[in-house]
């Protein structure tokens, strides 16, 4: 919808812990979480100034990311909605999808897209929002507001390419009898694709 599209740049700019170092304007450097930084670079490529967007949406309250809940949330006074309070949420797609009231066919389509991203070793994030109409509701715990339901803004797949020298280094370790394991917070599908790219996973491999 138009509302979903118009709020997306503000959601990315406001609900993040990352910054961009733009001293070299041709090659901005991400400061902070690289996945969050990739989203800032994406809206920058759409000709949005993330700092202007961030400054125009004052933060009311914020819920930091945690590995338990797998999302972060920021309640802002939205410039895009004439000062209304909007709660932006960003995190693991499987968590956010469960918090959105979606038709079955739409949920299935997003699930297929998510699987495609993960099978290509992409990091995945979902974004959603909740408009907080009542001043009283603004005082509620953010977790409670989130449980009231979200409007899905979209799912992002972000590629983090394997460095070219890694497969050869892995092979040298294996030839020397050194066991190599992948430890990651990503999904098993993403981990398997990364393992395939660096030579740790083949057709005969098992979980």
Model features per residue range: what roles?
Residues 162-172:
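The conserved cystathionine-beta-synthase
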């Amino acid at each position: 919808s138009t509302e979903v599209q118009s709020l997306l740049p503000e959601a990315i700019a406001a609900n993040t812990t990352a910054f961009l170092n733009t001293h070299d304007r041709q090659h901005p450097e991400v400061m902070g979480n690289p996945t969050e930084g990739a989203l800032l670079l994406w809206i920058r490529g759409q000709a949005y100034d993330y700092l202007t967007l961030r400054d125009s949406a004052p933060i009311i309250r914020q819920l930091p990311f945690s590995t338990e809940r797998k999302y972060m949330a920021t309640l802002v006074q939205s410039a895009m909605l004439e000062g209304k309070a909007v709660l932006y949420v960003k995190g693991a797609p499987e968590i956010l999808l469960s918090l959105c009231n979606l038709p079955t066919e739409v949920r299935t389509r997003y699930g297929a897209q998510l699987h495609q991203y993960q099978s290509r070793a992409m990091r995945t994030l979902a974004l959603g929002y909740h408009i907080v109409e009542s001043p009283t509701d603004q005082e509620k715990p953010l977790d409670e507001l989130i449980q009231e339901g979200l409007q899905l803004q979209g799912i992002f797949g972000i590629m983090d390419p394997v460095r070219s020298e890694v497969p050869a280094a892995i092979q040298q370790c294996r030839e020397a009898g050194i066991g190599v394991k992948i430890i990651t917070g990503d999904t098993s599908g993403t981990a398997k694709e990364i393992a395939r790219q660096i030579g740790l996973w083949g057709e005969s491999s098992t979980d």
